[in-house]
Design a protein with these regions (language model features):
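Polar/charged alpha-helical tracts
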Residues: 63-64, 72-76, 147, 189, ...
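Non-catalytic carbohydrate-binding regions of carbohydrate-active enzymes
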Residues: 4-10, 14-16, 240-346
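An acidic intrinsically disordered interaction segment
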Residues: 91-107, 137-147, 184-195, 302-307
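Aromatic-rich carbohydrate-recognition surfaces in CAZymes
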Residues: 127-134, 140-235, 240
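Well-ordered alpha-helical scaffold segments within catalytic/enzyme domains
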Residues: 86-92, 132-145, 175-188, 223-234, ...
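Low-complexity, Ser/Thr/Pro/Gly-enriched N-terminal "stalk/linker" regions
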Residues: 1-128
């Protein structure tokens, strides 16, 4: 995994809770930088898999912990207060060979739900992306947290997110249908419009148009089929084309295998590599799997993304801003989480 030299930090505020940034004895609001708590520390321990920070001070120990109810602070005197609260489900993943990694990756997903909206990274992306949102939906379904984004999905009013330079990306249609299906919005008015739009944009049953500035008919059409299937709608008219598509290795959800899908690791966009390794039959290299046995924080990331607003990181993570790097990142976290749970169970 790509690492950028930054001072240790941790994020609190999974799901609908206020987002809080911890570093070096200070806990601040991510929305305006205002101080929530601050103390001079003699030392600190960040226990990322336990969603816990322990601060050693001259007067004793301060603990901040996040659980299924909220974020709680206990000061040196033992006084306890809840800083922000709303329910989330936090499986322990006990017995899983990558238990600690799954705990952190799940945190990476939940921390990036802001105002009920699933975003790739809440610092540098202010709008949800349907692709990342659909991948997050898969994780939320596994962990019983779909309710966190149900209202956002119900309020959707556009067939495309138009986040990539305003382009109406064809894979969005299937991702939208999938999100609506899984969040229980099965009578949403966008569903018939999306089906009609997909037929309009199809040639011989395969979607046309762009995704990430290129044509990817196999990838786009497979997303469409998955979304329709999730809703129980007719897919007989959908025909996945037998043509080369560099994004075909990213779609493992239909169970197909491409033996040589995984090549070299992509440090800037690691979600591509984890998806391809999944499609290739769980072939992620030993180096990157070994890094998850004793994971640091954060695990997931993205670098040099064309639409990310990296300067928004500067008040909190200046080294990340300089490197045009954001972490955690939900598409990456979702691909890793789904790889590990599909391989070993949950």
């Amino acid at each position: 995994m790509k690492t950028i030299e930054e001072k240790p930090f941790f994020l609190f505020g999974m799901g609908a809770r206020e987002k809080l940034f911890y570093r070096n004895g200070a806990l601040v609001s991510c929305s305006d930088g205002s101080a929530v708590f601050q103390t001079e520390t003699l030392g600190e321990t960040i226990l990322a898999p336990e969603y816990t920070v322990r601060m050693e001070t001259k007067k004793g120990v301060v603990t901040v912990i996040e659980d299924e109810a909220g974020v709680h602070l206990t000061d040196e005197t033992g006084a306890h207060r809840t800083l922000t609260a709303s329910p989330v489900r936090l499986p322990d993943f006990a017995g899983h060979p990558y238990r600690d990694a799954l705990r952190i990756l799940h945190h990476d997903i939940l921390i990036n739900i802001i105002g009920g909206k699933p975003v790739p990274n809440f610092f540098v992306y202010k709008k949800p992306w349907y692709r990342d949102g659909a991948m997050m939906t898969m994780v939320l379904e596994k962990t019983g947290n779909l309710a966190l984004i149900r209202d956002w999905a119900a309020a959707l009013d556009a067939l495309y997110d138009r986040n990539n330079a305003g382009i109406e990306e064809s894979d969005n249609l299937g991702q939208l249908l999938y999100i609506l299906a899984k969040t229980g919005n099965t009578d949403h008015p966008l569903i018939p419009k999306a089906v009609e739009e997909a037929k309009r944009r199809s040639a011989d049953g395969a979607l046309t148009g762009l995704s990430d500035f290129s044509e990817h008919p196999v990838y786009q059409t497979k997303w469409l089929k998955l979304g329709l299937e999730a809703l129980g709608l007719d897919t007989d008219w959908v025909k996945v084309p037998a043509v080369p598509d560099s994004y075909s290795p990213l779609f493992w959800m239909d169970g197909h295998k491409e033996e040589h899908a995984y090549g070299s690791y992509c440090e800037n966009y690691p979600y591509l590599s984890w998806a391809a390794a999944h499609t290739a039959g769980f072939t992620m290299d030993k180096e990157h799997l070994a890094a998850l046995e004793k994971p640091g924080y954060p695990i997931s990331s993205e670098t040099e993304a064309s639409q990310a607003q990296y300067e928004l990181l500067r008040p909190f993570l200046p080294a990340y801003a300089d490197a045009r790097h954001s972490a955690p990142h939900t598409w990456h976290a979702a691909e890793m989480f789904l790889y590990l749970t599909d391989l070993y169970g949950i």
